[in-house]
Amino acid sequence: KVFTCPDRKNLEEVLDKVYASGYPDTMIIQDFIPGDDSYMRVLTNYSDRNGKVKLMCMGHVLLEEHTPHGIGNHAVILNEPCGPIAEKIKAFLEDIGYVGFSNFDIKYDQRDGKYKVFEINCRQGRSNYYVTGAGYNIAKLLVEDRVEGKELPFVLADNPSLWRVVPRKVAFEYIVSDYHQEMKQLMQQGREVRPLFYD
């Protein structure tokens, strides 16, 4: 899924192995952006039948999975207000007339102070329930737009909440301490969602 190559020689070795295994398509090569998991962001959007963005929800990824098959999957997300990167993505989606769900993986690059977009997933993300944690049910948006034909207002879903799929102990052990106080507050306030556990 993801290979980190420190130099061109290693890159060529990895590409040779991938193609030797029978992979027939092109590969994407991206600049490696330094920083731990807390430099990641996820932006979930819904664009209506007219290609207008109606919902944006920014998640600050605090921890990702680190198993070989889990790399790139979020484990803990803290909702945060959408910033200037969201405005650019909104303009992009509307310029191309995009319709439906979109999910962007973004990383803050401390080298130049800018956010870098890795990819757009033309679907809901695996961690999509963090949007519900912020108070917005995206299935409801879809029904109101496509089935009921309603005109939807534009919403920035930035209500604070914490989404996690790992045990509390793991979260606090592996997330940098800068975020612990906010995580504890949200847990105490009942503003935490854990989609793998039902009460």
Language model regions located:
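ATP-dependent carboxylate/phosphate-activation module, predominantly the ATP-grasp catalytic core
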Residues: V2, P6-K9, E13, D31-G97, ...
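A short beta-strand motif that forms the metal-chelation/ATP-contact edge
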Residues: G113-R123
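Glycine-biased flexible loop/turn sites that connect beta-strands or occur in inter-domain linkers
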Residues: G51, D112-G113
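Short, hydrophobic secondary-structure boundary micro-motifs
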Residues: M27, M56, F154-L156
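A short glycine-rich, hydrophobically flanked beta-strand micro-motif that places a catalytic Asp/Glu
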Residues: Q30-D31, V99-R111
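Short, basic and Ser/Thr-rich N-terminal targeting/leader segments
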Residues: Y23-D25, D37-R41, G100-S102
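Peripheral (often C-terminal) accessory segments that flank ATP-dependent C-N-forming ligase machineries
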Residues: E144-D199
